[in-house]
Curated annotation (Swiss-Prot):
Keyword Cytoplasm: no
Family assignment from sequence similarity: Belongs to the papillomaviridae E6 protein family.
The protein's name: Protein E6
Gene coding for it: E6
Location of this chain's protein in the cell: Host cytoplasm; Host nucleus
Zn finger residue spans: unnamed: 30-66, 103-139
Domain of life per record: Viruses
Amino acid sequence: MSARCGSTARTLFELCDQCNITLPTLQINCIFCNSILQTAEVLAFAFRELYVVWRNDFPFAACVKCLEFYGKVNQYRNFRYAAYAPTVEEETGLTILEVRIRCCKCHKPLSPVEKTNHIVKKTQFFKLQDSWTGYCLHCWKKCMEKGQRSETSC
């Protein structure tokens, strides 16, 4: 892939469109460890709607191990407080379904069902710096199976 190819792309889908390649054939390095992402990691990065990072006109993504590790670092460094849905709505001025909330473990955007799950189960969302996080159903289940679920982390 040339350095100029797709230099305005924000997502892997846009990058592939602009460079005229398919997602499974994309070879992209991790911004943190510089390893080449496996096909499954490329697909997971795209599915999670994460953004491409540009350095010196080259695109980077993040491998699964680094996403998990740096996600945990972000939790520890930037945790502000935990709050229930009404507080999130009051603070943002949006309904909980309109607020962009990502999973604090896998980083995918929470679906309306996943946000509703927090409300029904009376579980708090987490304020990290300027963004809100919670748990997707997949990560929620993994945390519950391990018995690690707490109000501040999994």
